[in-house]
Amino acid sequence: MVRTEVEIGRGLTIKNPVMTASGTYGYGTEYKDFIDIDRLGAIVVKGTTLHHREGNAYPRMAETPSGMLNAVGLQNKGVHYFVEHIYPVIKDYRTEMIVNVSGSTLDDYAETSRIINELEHIRAIELNISCPNVKQGGMAYGVTCEGAASVVKAVRRAYDKTLIVKLSPNVTDITEIARAVESEGADAISMVNTFLGMAIDAEKRRPILSTTTGGLSGPCIKPIALRMVWQTAKVVQVPIIGMGGIASAADAIEFLLAGATAVQVGCYNFVDPAAASYIVDGIEDYLRRHGISDVKELIGSLVIEHN
């Protein structure tokens, strides 16, 4: 028997370190006919904003070599719809349900978080700080220490449960952003969000996405994401939830070895709806094969030999 429980901040323990990434798993209900979703450690539901958002115009997704671009634009029906129609359906799932929160202003973030704070069976939120600050020329909150810290500070006043902050990789030094959000009360850090990229239709001489650029995810980003997790784990004390190109148990284990406490499976859910479940099984098999009794023994156990 191996132990797979991990703590992801403020005393919140999940049954295993495998989570699904926001925007790739809907509300979990969409996948319940494919797998036993209660087998997962946690499900991070799609991005939720204070008000209804239509999202960006089509086309807003594009396949790329070893990955995909997306520019969905946080399409959702708003937090009040979530409370009235989605929460009653998902609140009794036996896996942890985490709400991804996005906003255009600090007040938006704080108010959405305050509303979710009242939901008994939602014990954690994940802040998407890659959103543009509409009051500061559209620059994403998460690309400066000051911007990232301001979101966490505003939300921390309104939210008293586990607060996970999702970091943008589109920065010079992600460890500085990580330290900034930790100092303002983040209980955990999830990383990394998508990389800014673009795709072009050479025949038409036009960008493929309606927004020109979009977020790049998939196996192509894994080596960079892994490096960022490894660097960040050395400078923060809070748990790290690693993501970026995870498609197998071996991928997930690499992130744990680099210092992540848990992982999120993202766009590979589109390839195989049961991927996250297989990864849970694969981690357990790895622990048994290596005679490891507790998954926590893997966290940050990477051996680096210097010649």
Curated annotation (Swiss-Prot):
InterPro entries: Aldolase_TIM (IPR013785), DHO_dehydrogenase (IPR050074), DHOD_1B (IPR033888), Dihydroorotate_DH_1 (IPR024920), Dihydroorotate_DH_1_2 (IPR012135), Dihydroorotate_DH_cat (IPR005720), Dihydroorotate_DH_CS (IPR001295), Dihydroorotate_DH_I (IPR049622). The active site is at 131 (nucleophile). CDD domains: DHOD_1B_like. Pathway: Pyrimidine metabolism; UMP biosynthesis via de novo pathway; orotate from (S)-dihydroorotate (NAD(+) route): step 1/1. The keyword ATP-binding does not apply. Its EC number is 1.3.1.14. GO terms for biological process: 'de novo' pyrimidine nucleobase biosynthetic process; 'de novo' UMP biosynthetic process. One of its GO terms (molecular function) is dihydroorotate dehydrogenase (NAD+) activity. Its main location: cytoplasm. It catalyses: (S)-dihydroorotate + NAD(+) = orotate + NADH + H(+). One of its GO terms (cellular component) is cytoplasm. Substrate binds at residues 46, 70-74, 128, 193-194. FMN binds at residues 22, 46-47, 100, 128, 166, 192, 218, 244-245. Binds 1 FMN per subunit. It comes from the Bacteria. It is found in: Cytoplasm. Keywords: Cytoplasm, Flavoprotein, FMN, NAD, Oxidoreductase, Pyrimidine biosynthesis. Its cofactor is FMN. Catalyzes the conversion of dihydroorotate to orotate with NAD(+) as electron acceptor. Heterotetramer of 2 PyrK and 2 PyrD type B subunits. NCBIfam families: PRK07259.1, pyrD_sub1_fam. This is Dihydroorotate dehydrogenase B (NAD(+)), catalytic subunit. It comes from Porphyromonas gingivalis (strain ATCC BAA-308 / W83). The gene is pyrD.
